[in-house]
Amino acid sequence: MKPTVWHHLRLCPHGHPDETIDDAAIAVDETGTIVWLGAFSALPHGYAHWQREDLHGAWVTPGLVDCHTHLVYGGTRADEFAQRLAGVSYEEIARQGGGIVSTVRATRAADETTLFVQAAARLQPLLAEGVSAIEIKSGYGLDLASERKMLRVARQLGERFPVSVYTTFLGAHALPPEYAGRADAYIDEVCERMLPTLADEGLVDAVDVFCERIGFSLAQTERVFEAATRRGLPVKLHAEQLSNAGGTALAARYRALSADHLEFLDEAGVEAMKAAGTVAVLLPGAYYFIRETQLPPIELLRKHGVPIALATDHNPGTSPLESLLLTLNMGCTLFRMTVPEVLQGVTRHAAAALGRADRHGALEIGRQADFAVWSVGSLAELAYWIGRPLCEQVVRGGATVFRRMNG
């Protein structure tokens, strides 16, 4: 790759629309590393003979980060959509053997190739919206072989597509049918066999649990956290989505990277998150799709200065969402977040939720040149338009990996 100066651009280096540089330039060396950025008029003479890329006044932001997804799974759950419209609750569907467990059956039945092809089709719309880093959870296998299969597919997506994939082991997502009535025995399997084996195989970057009355108890969640800590793996948590179970305070005790959903989070939980440096990951797609009415405590999170991230929560049952830009709009319209909040929520704060704030979510000297080029007049348009293709170009490591074709 030739050293290149990207110029005639409007730069938002940290995802905050109030911190921008008009008529900016970014100098990227042959390794794909940013070696200079700032006002084009101040470009050092040493870069005068480098190759030039004129962006014609387009906006440039860091590559976006989708920090909570369940992208790898078999089948769909379209049939449950009609049930919910008829008034059946998500919890009741789960008790009837639907919900997560129905996806477990489909995922176990699918081979790796099938799972890869299906997940790749879900990933590509996100990449076309400027996503350069994504988290992918397991949790639809619920046995060692199937969880391994999911995590292997997630790793393969990162190898085959221009995106950084971070894997999360979510073995404690639901109770598999063969362990009905034996939740503690299943947690034994998760902690003593599944997690150690998959971690030793290099398939796990973090560990998550679904802590809820239809999921796992605080005591069971803590056992998984202890097992992850022994392996030196960071933890995160699905918490307070359907009730205030106290999971967020537990997550904070283990200095979790993030606590996610949080509709029923109280002020004590918010204070614990702030003290621990835990990021609040809000998932408006799930809130919208299952027609929740309890809003997450945005004002409390603001009051205590807890960083807020947004993610698609792409999954087959509660958020079949393949657009991080639509997530921005939902964050504004449903959760009453501001444009600066939602933009930082898919850049620097989303990177922090993955424990990767040093690699993603900002454009700085010394970092890899991962950025998105936007055909908008203002950054507010990223959260304003619904369904319009706004991403003109995606650059990863200084190389263009996506360019929208016009006409």
Swiss-Prot record:
NCBIfam families: hutI
Keywords, comma-separated and alphabetical: Cytoplasm, Histidine metabolism, Hydrolase, Iron, Metal-binding, Zinc
Tree of life domain: Bacteria
Organism: Burkholderia ambifaria (strain MC40-6)
Binding, Zn(2+): H68, H70, H238, D313
Residues reported in the UniProt entry to bind 4-imidazolone-5-propanoate: R77, Y140, H173, Q241, T318
Entry annotated with the keyword DNA-binding: no
Residues that bind Fe(3+): H68, H70, H238, D313
Protein name: Imidazolonepropionase
Database matches in CDD domains: Imidazolone-5PH
InterPro entries: Amidohydro-rel, HutI, Metal-dep_hydrolase_composite, Metal_Hydrolase
Pathway: Amino-acid degradation; L-histidine degradation into L-glutamate; N-formimidoyl-L-glutamate from L-histidine: step 3/3
GO BP terms: L-histidine catabolic process to glutamate and formamide; L-histidine catabolic process to glutamate and formate
Annotated cofactor note: Binds 1 zinc or iron ion per subunit.
Any single GO CC term annotated in Swiss-Prot or TrEMBL for this entry: cytoplasm
Compartments where located: Cytoplasm
GO MF annotation list: imidazolonepropionase activity; iron ion binding; zinc ion binding
Cofactor(s) the protein requires to work: Zn(2+); Fe(3+)
Pfam families associated with the record: Amidohydro_1
Functional summary from the UniProt entry: Catalyzes the hydrolytic cleavage of the carbon-nitrogen bond in imidazolone-5-propanoate to yield N-formimidoyl-L-glutamate. It is the third step in the universal histidine degradation pathway.
Reactions mediated catalytically: 4-imidazolone-5-propanoate + H2O = N-formimidoyl-L-glutamate
Family the UniProt entry places it in: Belongs to the metallo-dependent hydrolases superfamily. HutI family.
EC nos: 3.5.2.7
Amino acids binding N-formimidoyl-L-glutamate: Y140, N315, G317
